[in-house]
Amino acid sequence: SSNKETMKKFLHSMDAVLQHGDFMVVYPEQSMWWNYRKPKPLKKGAYTFAAQNHVPVLPCFITMQDSDILGDDGFYIQEYTIHIAPAIYPDPNKSRAVNIEEMRQKNYEVWKEIYEKTYGEPLVYECDDMPTIA
């Protein structure tokens, strides 16, 4: 939210929920692209909540396969599989900033492994091969 008071209330509520031992679903990529199969870049938010409240993140990654059923839109209906990986814990001996980055990197590596195992191909982003525009 662009409203500072709303954000303060949200952040306070998030801390309260996590410190109470409850769970919260956070999409660390902060957006969804319909039927996009590759992991999207992970933002810091979910890992910030985890690190500052000394709680783990539970990496979940959804893969999809075409079914045999052609939808009304001319595309095959997708079949989804939810992969739940082991929890990633913040290290109490490290700073919040280090934990945020390490947890984010570990989550990415888990997603990359799931992607490559499921689809049988290396995770490559086509835009990585494009020249940088200065």
PLM region spans:
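Catalytic core of membrane glycerolipid acyltransferases/transacylases, capturing the structured
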Residues: S1-E5
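Non-catalytic C-terminal accessory region of glycerolipid acyltransferases
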Residues: K8-A134
